[in-house]
Amino acid sequence: LFGEREPDRRARLLHVLIDRHGKNAVHISHAPQAPEEDEEEDEEFYTEGSHDLLIARRRMAAFSLQRAKELLRQQRRESTASMQEVAALRQTALEPLKSYTNLGTQVAAERPVSVVRFSPDASLLATGSWSGKASLWSIPNATPCGTMHAHEDRITGLAWHPRATIGQPRSAIHMATGAGDGAICTWSLESERPLSVLRGHEARVCRIAFHPMGDYLASASFDGTWRLWDVARAQELMLQEGHSREVYAIDFQGDGALVASGGLDAIGRVWDTRTGRTAMVLDGHAREILGLAFAPNGYQLVSTSGDDTARVWDLRMLRSLYTIPAHHSSVADVRFFRAAESSLPSMDEDGSDTHSLSRSGLYFATAGYDGLVKIWSADDWQLVKSLRGDAGKVMSVDLSSDGQYVASGEWARTFKLWGHV
């Protein structure tokens, strides 16, 4: 009726029902009704893993405990170094970066170069592009060494095996690529055909990373999951949920105990590879997380985002340590410097350490859609050097293990090599 409100309609309906069925036949409940849930409640749940996953977790636990023990020994030794030694090492590592310049630009593909990665011995640079092609280039001449027509869609993930080019047989797995076709391919240095193709993701594969052991590989995907693979057996070991949107970035801690994932939900998560549980939630970015990199010290992590910032996280304090206003546009990639020599000391027969202080982790680089590559010190988070190209968006960056070069992949279908003239 005109002007009738909801209580009036209820009263009128009550009178109609009483007149029709009698007062005793009608039961009216005035208890408030709980609103229907449009969405399922978020809850933590666990899925029983396979026996193969159990074996993998045990192997990763044994590996990580030994690596952590050696790293702790190294850090204890470095803690006794004098301030003069630390300052001299810092100057030796950072001062040359200030004179870096563009050594050359190379057209790498028919479409944007989405990812660049140096081989562990810094003798090769691998590039992946939106054309689905992966290429190898010799360093420092940037001459082509091989091309792999890897995928039917854009390559968005590329990673070198930890022992590639430094002891791995040429016929063994040296590299892996992931792409928009949902597949991950593993490659040797002897053939332009993949050794294996890992399938399981239901959408685009983004960043990928090898576990430091080299036996396992993690992949992030737009299907909202990241997965763990046994690369030797070409077998999926685990499907991990935990993000409300697409998962873009993935990286392993140096000793292999932790793995970090970052999503387009602006949330990052640090997972314990030995138990599968979440160790830390990275909540602070305003937009999607595009890059993740663990520091060689094992307890710090840098994330980069579409909010133009890089955040430094401390895994011991479980919080964000510092926010760097890194670029004027999205920060697409981040990589720490890891020295070619082992970051862990060798020991004399009498048990004394023989290596000098390691340069690993003293600085890192970020790539931005503002056309810049920036190098930052990893102790005070200050800008050391800004490298500007002329090709628009910089989509990826990497640092060579010999400390001589920086490589950047660009929207303009090219990659640049930076260093000393």
Question: Model-derived features: where do they sit?
Answer:
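Intrinsically disordered terminal extensions that flank WD40 beta-propeller domains
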Residues: 1-111
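Nucleotide-binding motor/catalytic cores of P-loop/tubulin-like NTPases across gene-expression machines
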Residues: 382-383
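WD40 beta-propeller repeat fold
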Residues: 77-242, 249-251, 281-283, 322-326, ...
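Short, well-ordered alpha-helical segments in soluble proteins
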Residues: 212, 233, 244, 254, ...
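Eukaryotic tandem repeat interaction scaffolds
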Residues: 250, 257-369
